[in-house]
Swiss-Prot record:
It is found in: Cytoplasm. Its main location: cytoplasm. Residues 156-179, 826-859, 1009-1020 have a biased composition (Low complexity). Residues 1-100, 144-201, 360-381, 422-441, 454-526, 556-575, 803-864, 940-974, 1005-1024 are annotated as: Disordered. Residues 72-83 have a biased composition (Acidic residues). This is Uncharacterized protein C688.07c.
Length: 1038
């Protein structure tokens, strides 16, 4: 077996010796043969042969490209290989090499079965190439494609390199080549590859560059005949008109055999109006080769107009301006400064000859119309290209620039282009337009097109190309522009198009990677039908512009409602991010003032779409100023800030916002002093009461930090999207845990209002959905005070040090509304902010007295609730308390859960979150034991030993504990079953880690002593004693 493999390897065709002494393969790889050596034969012999052709053939029967056998070459290679093998085998005996054959690479064999997984096989480089080719054939067969197909070189879009390489391969096969010839052919092939990668410069505009694409994307693909009448060019917008000009058959190209990437006219019936000059390398200078079948009609507009008239039997007035987009020649950069000088010298001759040719064409225009109508397109193109050939016969190696001369006929028709170009490293190109006083209606479209072509490239400026949005197909755009009739709208938009180019959403959309600007506001009033059409067809920016124009025209609330609640808008296909963007774009219209609505920059810093993370003193002042600016700038038509506070006016102001979500910018733009704030902020009230600890000061822009975050809204804008679904998104419970649902909101003044300066309070229905029953309680939360009022630090300290208690029990009836007993004005809610659990009765009595004198702060409400509670206390008015129905409802509420942690973004928010949780646990535990004991005594399960201190009791005592608690617990872990994390366990962990640290210190000390002193038996024994210092051998071997 070894001898057979050695024979096969010696007979392998592609193996040759490199200069370095190793064996290399001449079998071409898929990207071209990258192995090149001075001793190897020319690459051109096998440059067109792929390894897929060599599969399954005996190497002895393989033929060269000229048909001669390779057997003679293989015999010579065999002798070389045997000589080398004998010399290598002597060395391998001495050095104990593992491979059986000396000069090969060691490849890993693919595992065909389990026992061959680790087996390696000695494979030569040529054999490995054949293995890869076999694998490629197998994959192509599996995919259902032709397994014998050659690999495509995607870098070469033109066939010039393949044709030249095939010619050179034939030449090299016939003539025996020396090493110098090999080098020349190698250099030529490298130059050809380099030319294909060169980015060509053209005298084209960035908008027209989009038209250069393979004809497989054309809409007339594989059309056998040219259509008699072209579709009229509609003026839907400037961008689609450029595309239609490019795809119209006026600029159909004659067939060219050497350009396989662009099909012929007879097959396609259309083409792009640019022809790339095929560059070839014949000598040192790079030249532009003009094919005889190729048509360069940049000098003359007359022949193009005659050509278009012959193609169209019924000539429409819209086709006149199509003549202007003549085919512009591309220039390739010269190699040296000499070529630039020669080109500048020849430039004047070219201009003069071009003028003469254009004059001749002016005289013979009538003849051309009669002749071109009867001849096919290819003959016309050949005749037209003869004029260009006369110019080029003088010096074909020069790089030439074609200059477009405006003919008299075009200027009489009303417009022409003047193109100026100069030779430099960065070509300066200008597109100018000469309008005439009497302009036709069909020209309004081409005017906007021309104005977008008026781009000037400076030497150092960065030119940003117009990029289509990825969501618009060219076919869809073309069909839309064909289906829209221009008609009456053209007369209205004529003056606008002359004054300014129309902003198309594909250019100025958010999807564009380069440009972003809010859309221009559409002028004129929009009907509902037009509005629905635009909502269905156009992009997101069109919708934003439509709604903004509605608001400028003082549209009614119902119209805005139809826009935002349109089912077609909510059912748009798209990813989650696109839905988010749609919703944010519509909901943030109010928050964008008019001063920067049309600016091409991003949203301002004080926009409500930005959330400020973290808080400093400067941030709060900045946000305070920005909020005041917003209130002055934004439209608050629907809510009258200083109007009456009757419920009717409030309902009228809130009606269109019935389906609004948490964090809508309308809720963040209302002034803080207004009485309607509670009604507009009804959605963010519950979340604010839970996460109010994120701001230490009553700054509304900071307290609504989380409610304006896009995490809360989840990007949905349906009508049925209520607050319940928002909170289910924020706290995704897997079990049927209770959620807080806000049902209605109403304004109620305080019942016993004696002083006129008393603030109003908003009463919110809070519905606690338990596992089976729902108990709704009316709760009371005070509104924010204004910014100007300073905080009383003493009150805050008293409130922080006071001990919290749970709310008092109601009357045993089934009334929902809870009234306080004895008119005591404690604002003690479900939790309080701070307070370590005290273990003596005197501390408890003191804390209860403190709670009667000064109200304790609610963890959910902001710090401002304390001062408002004190003002209520002076009034002795009744307040409705906000607390949960059962113990389960409180323990499983979002207040006690960590589910909201994933929604918080920054480290500051998480830090505040954990700090608040610690305060919640300590405050909750401080009054919990007495509350549970009081519940048990009320149910008769515990004997009445002594009357408990005046505390509150729950609404219902459905929760019955299995184990009675008679004394207040010393640690929070004993009182509540849910809190499993104990301080003692934490201390044990820390003590363990500290013990390990001390042990490491002892070990280091022992090591240092060992290194300093001589190693003796006593020092070793001491170090071993150190390891058992803590009574345990912690993983060490003694």
């Amino acid at each position: 077996m070894e001898e057979n493999t050695a024979q096969k390897q010696s007979n392998a065709t592609g193996l040759q010796r490199h200069v370095s002494g190793r064996w290399i393969s001449n079998v071409p790889s898929y990207e071209g043969n990258e192995w090149s050596s001075e001793e190897s034969e020319s690459e051109d012999k096998e440059s067109n042969l792929t390894s897929s052709e060599n599969i399954g053939k005996n190497p002895e029967r393989e033929l060269n490209s000229d048909g001669t056998d390779r057997i003679i070459e293989e015999e010579e290679e065999e002798d070389d290989i045997e000589n080398e093998a004998s010399s290598f085998s002597e060395q391998s005996e001495n050095e104990n090499y593992d491979f059986s054959y000396p000069g090969t690479f060691v490849y890993r064999k693919a595992a065909s079965s389990s026992h061959e997984t680790l087996a390696t096989k000695v494979v030569s480089a040529d054999e490995s190439a054949r293995l890869w080719a076999e694998k490629r054939r197998f994959l192509l067969q599996k995919l259902g494609k032709d397994p014998n197909s050659k690999p495509i070189d995607y870098k070469s879009s033109m066939a010039s390199s393949s044709t030249r390489s095939s010619q050179s391969s034939q030449v090299s096969a016939i003539q025996p080549q020396s090493q110098d010839d090999n080098r020349v052919s190698d250099i030529r092939q490298m130059e050809n590859r380099r030319e294909l990668n060169v980015k060509r410069r053209s005298v084209s505009s960035p908008a027209e560059d989009l038209a250069i694409r393979p004809l497989s994307f054309s809409r007339y693909k594989k059309a056998e005949e040219i259509p008699e009448s072209l579709p009229p060019i509609k003026g839907r917008d400037s961008f689609s008109s450029v595309r239609e000009l490019n795809e119209s058959n006026v600029f159909a190209r004659a067939p060219n055999k050497n350009r396989f990437s662009f099909a012929s006219v007879a097959e396609t019936g259309s083409g792009s109006n640019f022809s790339r000059a095929t560059s070839s390398r014949s000598s040192k200078t790079r030249s532009v080769v003009y094919e005889p079948n190729h048509r360069h009609t940049s000098f003359f507009g007359d022949t193009l107009s005659n050509l278009s008239s012959s193609l169209n039997d019924k000539k429409s007035p819209n086709d006149d301006h199509a003549v202007l987009d003549s085919e512009l020649m591309e220039q390739t950069l010269p190699d040296s400064a000499e070529a630039v000088e020669i080109a500048n010298n020849v430039k004047e001759d070219i201009v003069s000859t071009a003028n003469d040719d254009a004059n001749e064409l002016d005289n013979t225009s009538e003849k051309a119309t009669l002749e071109t109508s009867s001849k096919p397109v290819t003959e016309q193109a050949i005749e037209q290209s003869e004029v260009v050939q006369e110019v080029e016969e003088g010096d074909t190696n020069m790089t030439t620039n074609t200059i477009l001369k405006p003919t008299d006929e075009i200027i009489n028709k009303g417009y022409a282009y003047s193109i100026t170009s100069s030779h430099s490293n960065h070509s300066n190109e200008k597109f100018e337009q000469i309008p005439s006083p009497d302009e036709k209606l069909s020209r309004t479209d081409i005017d906007t097109h021309v104005k977008q072509l008026q781009t000037t490239k400076s030497t150092d400026s960065l030119s940003i190309p117009f990029v289509e949005s990825p969501q618009q197909n060219p076919e869809e755009e073309l069909s839309d522009s064909l289906s829209n009739d221009f008609g009456i709208d053209a007369e209205k938009e004529k003056d606008e198009n002359l004054s300014k180019p129309e902003h198309h959403p594909s250019i100025t959309s958010v999807n564009s990677p380069f440009l972003y600007s809010p859309s221009k506001q559409p002028s004129g009033e929009l009907d509902e039908e037009n509005l629905k059409l635009r909502l269905q067809d156009s992009d997101v920016d069109d919708e934003v512009a439509t709604i903004r124009s509605l608001k400028q025209n003082n549209a009614t609330n119902s119209e805005v409602e139809t826009v935002t609640n349109d089912p077609s808008f909510s059912q748009q296909p798209g990813t989650h991010s696109r839905i988010l963007r749609n919703f944010d774009a519509i909901s943030s219209i109010d928050s964008i003032p008019d001063s920067f609505s049309d600016s091409a920059v991003d949203l301002p810093v004080d926009s409500s779409k930005y959330t400020l993370v973290g808080k400093t003193q400067s941030n709060s002042n900045l946000l305070q100023d920005n909020a005041e600016k917003h209130i002055s700038k934004s439209n608050l038509e629907k809510v009258d800030v200083k109007g009456d506070t009757s419920p009717n006016s409030v309902e009228q102001g809130i009606e269109p916002q019935a389906a609004s979500v948490v964090g809508s910018p309308r809720s963040s733009l209302v002034s803080n002093n207004s009485l309607e704030e509670g009604a507009l902020l009804k959605n963010s009230e519950s979340l604010e009461s839970i996460y109010g600890y994120l701001s230490e000061e009553p700054d509304p822009a900071l307290t609504k930090l989380n409610t304006e975050d896009p995490f809360w809204t989840k990007g949905s804008s349906d009508d049925e999207h209520t607050i319940a679904s928002v909170e289910q998104d924020v706290y995704p419970y897997k079990t049927s845990l209770p959620t807080i649902v806000e049902a209605t909101t109403s304004h109620t003044e305080s019942s016993n209002s004696k002083a006129p300066a008393i603030e109003e309070t908003t009463t919110t229905k809070v519905e606690v959905v338990a596992a089976h029953d729902a108990v709704s309680i009316s709760s009371n939360s005070s509104t924010h005070k204004s910014h100007s009022e300073p905080l009383n630090r003493d009150e805050l300290e008293v409130a922080a040090l006071s001990r919290g208690s749970l709310p008092e029990p109601p009357k045993p009836n089934k009334q929902i509304v809870v009234q306080e007993e004895d008119q005591r004005d404690t604002l003690s809610l479900k939790t309080s902010t701070t307070g370590l659990s005290s273990h003596s009765k005197s501390a408890e009595n003191n804390s209860t007295q403190q709670s009667t004198t000064s109200p304790s702060i609610n963890s959910g409400a902001s710090a401002d609730a304390v001062s408002s509670g004190i003002s209520k206390k002076a009034d002795n008015s009744e307040t409705n308390l906000n607390y949960f129905a059962t113990l389960d409802a409180f323990v499983k509420s979002p207040l006690m859960s960590f589910d909201g942690l994933g929604e918080l973004g920054s480290t500051d928010q998480r830090y505040n979150f954990f700090n608040q949780k610690i305060q919640e646990y300590s405050a909750y535990d401080s009054g919990l034991d007495n509350w549970i004991q009081f519940c048990l005594e009320k149910d008769g399960e515990a004997p009445k030993e002594a009357p408990p201190p005046p505390r509150s009791e729950p609404v219902s005592t459905t929760t019955k504990l299995a184990k009675r608690i008679t004394q207040p617990s010393l640690s929070p872990a004993r009182s509540t079953v849910t809190i499993t994390h104990n301080i003692a366990t934490e201390a044990k962990k820390k003590s363990k880690s500290a013990a390990n640290d001390i042990l490491h210190l002892f070990k280091k000390k022992a090591k240092s002593e060992q290194s300093n002193a001589k190693s003796s038996s006593s020092s070793i024994k001491e170090s071993k004693k150190m390891k058992t210092l803590f009574g345990k051998k912690l993983g060490f071997k003694s």
